[in-house]
């Protein structure tokens, strides 16, 4: 048999998302999208030493005074009652683009590091209607129970070009390579870095 279910009556599933470390001024990370009948939105989360950065793109052809984007953060991912860290950018403060707008939101945070997990959600207001990424109950102001689980990952460094000899000895070329932190199992207490070089034929990893 067939049955219709109101999705807003179901308990929201918790989405796992990745937040890449931002390197320089270029925003490069995974894009996540969400929508309803009238609004389409997508965001790219990144992080740096000063906090969380979220680039949100909204397709909404009709301009209203209440149009806005809000990012909610639970720094400890407590998944419970909380007063979240939040930042809102109104449409009038955002960059206008064809068919909508683009908002860049900075959420100041400290002690961010690779493999740290935080809770976060994104809400888009289209006139008087809220469109939410994860918490479909719309209770982000008081609870992080249905925030998405966001894991901080290392950014992609620029890999230096160089050729080395594979003989168990560290060639001088490794001195110019950038050390890239490796993501260890979240329950592990150890950390590790690796250096990477490349030439026209090979990719070299020194760890």
Regions found by a protein language model. Give the residues of each.
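Surface-exposed, glycine/proline- and aromatic-rich loop segments on solvent-exposed faces
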Residues: 31-90, 127-130, 176-207
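A generic structural motif
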Residues: 3, 54, 101-105, 203-205
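A short, structured loop/turn motif at beta-sheet edges
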Residues: 49, 109-115, 200
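An exposed acidic His-Trp-rich patch
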Residues: 87-97, 101
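Intrinsic disorder/low-complexity segments
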Residues: 4, 8, 21, 42-43, ...
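Acidic/polar low-complexity flexible segments
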Residues: 1-26, 67-90, 111-171
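Solvent-exposed residues in well-ordered beta-strands and their adjoining turns
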Residues: 57-59, 106-110, 125
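Localized edge beta-strand/strand-to-loop motifs within extracellular or lumenal beta-rich domains
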Residues: 97-113
């Amino acid at each position: 048999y067939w049955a219709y279910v109101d999705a807003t009556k179901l308990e929201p599933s918790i989405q796992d998302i990745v937040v890449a470390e931002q390197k320089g001024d270029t925003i490069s990370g995974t894009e996540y999208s969400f929508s309803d009948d009238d609004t389409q939105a997508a965001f790219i989360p990144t992080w740096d030493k000063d906090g969380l950065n979220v680039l949100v793109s909204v397709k909404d052809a009709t301009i209203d005074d209440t149009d806005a984007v809000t990012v909610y953060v639970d720094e400890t991912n407590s998944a419970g009652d909380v007063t979240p860290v939040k930042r809102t950018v109104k449409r009038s403060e955002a960059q206008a683009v064809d068919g909508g707008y683009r908002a860049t939101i900075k959420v100041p945070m400290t002690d961010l590091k690779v493999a740290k997990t935080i809770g976060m959600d994104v809400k888009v207001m289209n006139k008087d209607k809220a469109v939410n990424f994860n918490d479909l109950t719309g209770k982000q102001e008081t609870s992080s129970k249905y925030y998405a689980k966001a894991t901080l990952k290392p950014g992609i460094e620029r890999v230096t070009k160089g050729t080395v000899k594979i003989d168990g000895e560290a060639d001088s070329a490794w001195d110019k390579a950038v050390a890239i932190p490796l993501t260890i199992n979240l329950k592990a207490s150890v950390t590790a870095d690796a250096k990477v070089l490349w030439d026209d034929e090979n990719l070299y990893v020194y760890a």
